[in-house]
Amino acid sequence: MPPSLHVTFLCHAATHAMKTARFPTGDEPPAYDNRAALAQRFAHFDGRVIASPAPVARATAAWIASSVETSDAFSDIDYGRWRGHAIRAIADKDPEGMSAWLTNVDARPHGGESIAMLSERIANALATLVHDDARTGRYLIVTHAIVVKAALAHVRGDPLESIFAMDFAPLSSITLDYDRQRGVWTVA
């Protein structure tokens, strides 16, 4: 097992839902083809590429590597009955629910997953990676911005509420390193 682990989280490409301020449906393709930029950016990546099962994440990952694994652990948060709906329409129809969603990590006004539930799932996924015996110890996880936020809050030990103040653009990335000897995560 390598002495350290390097996990790069990459936010998937933009989707039409993102461009039109809608909650995702989970089956959106990328709105633009960004393969040239990503191929150059990750040309020398030599680890495992793991994507959320969402088509946009799988397509983004396929622009980088010919061999891509998928993992439900890195799926988008479950937006429940809000899937596919315009954010403004939900805010108008259910202002209390939207307010709770934007301020309370345990809120699930849509009937799906709360931020706290997502964060627990991501913490478990990171623990699984820590115990993986991959030869390179390098991972590229292509996923959703909310998943990246949850991972960052977890490794930094930040309160989950910090997720509300984070913003990750499509195709932005962050690398998290884990020192197996010290048992410590750091933001690279």
What are these regions (language model features)?
Residues 63, 150, 154:
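Active-site signature of alpha/beta-hydrolase-fold catalytic machinery across serine-
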Residues 97-117:
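Short glycine/proline- and acidic residue-enriched helix-loop micro-motifs
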